[in-house]
Structure formats: C-alpha cells, structure tokens
C-alpha cells in the first residue's frame, strides 16, 4: 500500500483481545495516530475534540450497541466507519446503517477481512478528500464571482 500520508484511526471496542488484534493490523507508517477507547460515550467526547479518517467500532459496547455511534460519525464527519456485529445481527444492522455509508462486517471474522475492509475505507476516504477539495475550489470560485459582481 503506497500512501502519501497516514490515516488517523479511532478504535472503539470493549474487547481487549480485539483491540490488541486490530492494533496489529495498523502499522504506524500507514495508520497514525491510533486511539483506542472502550465505550461510546468516550468515543463521542473524543470525536468532539479530534477528527479521524477511520473509525472502527466493535459491537456491542458497554454503554451503547454502537450502531448509533456509527451513524452519528458518518452523518457528522467524512470519516470512514467499519462496524463489526455478530453474524446473527448482520442483516438487520446492515439494513439500518448502509444508507449512512457505514461498512458492516459480521463476526466472527478474520484478520484478512478486517485488513481488506480497512483498505476499502482508506480508498473511500481518499475519494472523500478529492470531493472535498473540489467542493472547496467551487466555493472559492463562487466567492470570487460574488466579489466581482459586487464590484460591478
């Protein structure tokens, strides 16, 4: 994977085993900083103070299932979100979050699937960056046109 920069990652999971495993999939040269939190409330506070490129949520969380957090992150930021849910809940959760842009992965899973989904999120994040850059350019041109029109 060749990148010009590293992706900031927020991992939200109550499982120490999962947290250790996912950290092994996030080498610093591609993913930095990596912040690990164990509950939705802490994640919400963190997201108010810092922005992240990728958010990985391993459900359930001790204070919230995690689906609402995933939806909120997608609705309020450009971060890519990976939501891991038990296989018996996958179809219901997927149907509720796909419209917001959340990528859902059923558990149990393996390291390769998580790694592949993280790469998909990186590609999606790059696409989002390109769109944001184009939008900024268009907005700047609109400002210039308005300024010229006022001068006339």
Predicted regions and their residues:
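Conserved acidic segment of CheY-like receiver
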Residues: 5-17, 22-26, 36, 55
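C-terminal output helix
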Residues: 109-118
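A short, hydrophobic beta-strand element within the central beta-sheet of small alpha/beta folds
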Residues: 78-88
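The C-terminal output helix
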Residues: 119-132
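C-terminal output/effector regions of signal-responsive regulators
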Residues: 136-152
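Alpha4 helix (beta4-alpha4-beta5 surface) of REC/receiver domains from two-component response regulators
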Residues: 68, 87-104
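Conserved phosphotransfer microenvironments
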Residues: 19, 43-44, 54-74, 88-89
């Amino acid at each position: 994977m060749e990148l010009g920069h590293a992706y900031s990652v927020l991992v939200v999971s109550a499982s120490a085993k999962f947290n250790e495993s996912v950290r092994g999939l996030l080498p610093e040269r591609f993913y930095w900083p990596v912040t690990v939190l164990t509950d939705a409330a802490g994640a919400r506070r963190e997201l108010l103070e810092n922005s992240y490129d990728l958010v990985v949520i391993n459900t359930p969380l001790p204070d919230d299932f995690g689906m609402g957090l995933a939806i909120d992150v997608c609705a309020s930021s450009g971060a890519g979100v990976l939501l891991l849910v038990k296989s018996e809940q996958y179809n219901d959760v997927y149907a509720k979050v796909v419209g917001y842009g959340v990528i859902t992965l059923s558990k149990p899973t393996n390291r390769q699937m998580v790694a592949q989904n993280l790469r998909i999120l990186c590609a999606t994040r790059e696409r989002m960056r390109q769109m944001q850059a184009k939008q900024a350019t268009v907005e700047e041109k609109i400002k210039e046109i308005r300024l010229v029109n006022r001068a006339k």
